Amino acid sequence: PYTTLFRSVVSQSMREKGLDYKLNFGIELPRLKEIAARYEKNHEVAQALWKENIRECKILAGMLQPVETFYPEIADIWVEDMRYPEIAELTCMSLFQYLPYASEKAFEWMADEREYFQLCGFMLMARLLMKGNQLTERSEAEFLDQAMATLQSEGVLPRKAAATALKKFAVQSKENGKKVNRLLAPLTKSDKVEIASLAGEIKLETEYWH
C-alpha cells in the first residue's frame, strides 16, 4: 500500500505537469537521484511533491526545485514542515546550499529556537564552510557564539549539527582550529557527559587536520 500510494501520488503529480513518471520501488537515495536527473527542474512539481507527507516525495522535491523560484519565505515553510533529520540533511544538500541567500538563512535559522530551524541552520552552515565560504569577523563571532550555545543546549539534533559545523570551521585554517579549541577547553571538562564527549570529538578532529 505504501509503495502504491507513493507511486500514484508521484505519477499523478508528474502527469498533471505533463511528465510521464514510472517508478519502480526500492527507493534508495542513488535511485532517487537517478529519477530526479531524468527531469528538468520544475517549481510546480517540486511544490506538489513537497506537500505530500511521504519521505521519497520530499527528497525528490528538493532535487527538482529550481533555485530561482525558491523564495526565502518558501524555504521557511519547508523547514516548518520537516519532521525527520534525513529530510533536513538531504534538502540542505540538494537545494538549500545553492540558494543565493543561503548564508543569510543559515544565520537566521541557527538563531531560531525551533529544533528543525536550528538543525537546518547548522547543517547549511557546515555545507557552506565545506565549499570554502569564509566568514567575516562579525559573522564568525556570531557563528561561534551560536554554535557554542547550541552545543550546551538540550536539543540533541541541533547539538550534533552545531558540532559538525564547528568541525568544518575549525579545519578551514590553523587559526580557526585554535579559536575553536580555546572555546572548547572548558566544555571538555563539563559534568554533562554528552557535552564533554562532543567537545572532545571536535577537538580531536581539529588536531587531526592540523
Q: What do these predicted ranges mean?
A:
Residues P1-H210:
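Alpha-helical scaffold domains
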